Amino acid sequence: VFEVVIVCVLSYLTGSIPSALWAGKLTRGIDIREHGSGNVGTTNTFRVLGWKAGVAVASVDLWKGWFSAQYIAKIVPHHPEYHVVVSMMAGIIAVIGHMFPLYSGFKGGKGALTAGGVMLGVVPISALLAMGTFLVLLFTTRY
């Protein structure tokens, strides 16, 4: 039980990493929450800071979910039947951390890329197919 609590805390703290907020401070010295939509997420980062910062924030947001599901979950000694459950739990808590981050007043992003990272960690082939489909639709329809 103690290991499960540790996984939950570490996953939440990992999900709470405010990558968009840090990108705004590092690239332009601004608080991203005061610009664009005011959201601390990847979309607002692309809109306000440009594609380079947007790609960096997207990568970190994706990594937060993947890392929690793939590595933090391994703290719990797992039986093969429970590995997916523990990985999903760690990932979901990372998404909650992204949406309600401790480090930035519990106001975060929407969690889509962090959830995508969880999918990459738990069901990588399905995640890659879904992301590929999304990108094809995005670039062909521009919507």
PLM regions and their residue ranges:
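Helix-coil boundary and interhelical linker segments in multi-pass alpha-helical membrane proteins
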Residues: 1-7, 67-89, 120-129
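N-terminal signal-anchor transmembrane alpha helix
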Residues: 2-27
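Hydrophobic residues within alpha-helical transmembrane segments
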Residues: 10, 59-63, 125, 129, ...
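C-terminal ends of transmembrane helices
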Residues: 20-23, 97-107, 134-142
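Cytosolic, membrane-interface loops and tails of multi-pass inner-membrane proteins
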Residues: 22-52, 108
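Interfacial segments of multi-pass membrane proteins
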Residues: 46-50, 72-76, 93, 111-141
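Alpha-helical membrane segments and adjacent membrane-interface helices in multi-pass membrane proteins
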Residues: 51-76, 87-99
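Hydrophobic, well-structured mid-protein blocks that either form specific transmembrane helices
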Residues: 79-113, 118
